[in-house]
């Protein structure tokens, strides 16, 4: 499913090349960049010592954070908001990054059961871990 008015926002893309964008150009540009993230773990795939048990691809936190910023800065406020809320809030996805080991979650959203802040063991070596994405 691709969001109306876009060619890149959704599962896969409908573009006839990387330069083609839908009518919601700014939102679609954000989705295209996100789709081209170089650091990802395919559905049911493994990388960096992590296994993605989800039925969809998960990306590095760097790519997800850039996607979130891009959507927030988009002039296409309605379409960007819809895409952002769907990806970041409804899907309840996770991203991965290299960081100090998580000791515990400091703040957890009671409604969506999503971790917001973490305590880290800063004396241990960094390792790749899953992190909940922020709500949109």
Curated annotation (Swiss-Prot):
GO terms of biological process kind: arachidonate secretion; lipid catabolic process; phospholipid metabolic process
Glycosylation site positions: 16
Keyword check for Hydrolase: yes
Highest rank taxon of the organism: Eukaryota
Cysteine pairs bridged by disulfides in the record: 9-31, 30-70, 37-63, 61-95, 105-117
Cofactor section: Ca(2+)
EC number: 3.1.1.4
Annotated GO CC locations: extracellular region
Binding sites annotated in the UniProt record for Ca(2+): 8, 10, 12, 35
Enzyme class, first EC level, given as a word: hydrolase
Reactions catalysed: a 1,2-diacyl-sn-glycero-3-phosphocholine + H2O = a 1-acyl-sn-glycero-3-phosphocholine + a fatty acid + H(+)
InterPro entries: PLipase_A2_dom, PLipase_A2_dom_sf, PLipase_A2_His_AS
Coiled coil: none
Protein name listed in UniProt: Phospholipase A2
Organism: Bombus terrestris (Buff-tailed bumblebee)
Species lineage: Eukaryota, Metazoa, Ecdysozoa, Arthropoda, Hexapoda
């Amino acid at each position: 499913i691709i969001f109306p008015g876009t060619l890149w926002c959704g599962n896969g893309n409908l573009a006839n090349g990387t330069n083609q964008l839908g009518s919601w150009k700014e939102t679609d540009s954000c989705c295209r960049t996100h789709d081209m993230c170089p650091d990802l773990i395919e559905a049911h795939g493994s990388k960096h010592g992590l296994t993605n048990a989800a039925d969809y691809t998960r990306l590095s936190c760097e790519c997800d954070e850039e996607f979130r910023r891009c959507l927030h800065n988009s002039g296409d406020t309605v379409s960007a908001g819809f895409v952002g809320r769907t990806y970041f809030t409804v899907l309840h996805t996770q991203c991965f990054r290299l960081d100090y080991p998580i000791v515990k979650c400091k703040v957890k959203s009671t409604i969506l059961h999503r971790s917001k802040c973490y305590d880290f063991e800063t004396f241990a070596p960094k390792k790749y871990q899953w992190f909940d994405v922020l709500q949109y």
